[in-house]
Amino acid sequence: MRRPTLSAAIAATVIGLSSLSASAGVIEDRKANFKANNASMRAIGAALSAEDFETVTSEAQKIAAWAMVMPDYFPEGSGEGTSAKPAIWSDFIGFKDAAEANYHAAEDLIAAARKQDAGQAGEALRALGATCKACHQKFKSW
């Protein structure tokens, strides 16, 4: 009779540890993606100054790709010890909407860069930055 109880306890411990490990992995992955996103924003600024629209396009594509999957990197319970505000999970639809706004802003930048219109691309970059800032204000602790 004790054997199934012990087995159940061991299974629960293993499952709990694997969840903890998965959570730690997703946190590290999302931090790496946010750092890459920040590097892309800096690269876009420099490329735009040089009217290097190919780089603007490729870096904005990276941002758009990250925005599409960003919410997947915030599973329930992955906020402990991070700068992620609880609002991410209490307003997950709003968080997903913010990621979608970021995606659309990146797509607008891609469209402007493909036209090789520096003025329009500059406006699109500012709009993209505004989506980052809005999300950070609502969902990130500083």
For the regions a protein language model found, what residue spans apply to each?
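N-terminal signal peptide c-region/cleavage motif recognized by signal peptidases
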Residues: G16-S23
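Compositionally biased non-globular segments, especially hydrophobic aliphatic-rich helices
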Residues: A11-G16, N102
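Processing junctions and N-termini across compartments
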Residues: S18, R126-G129
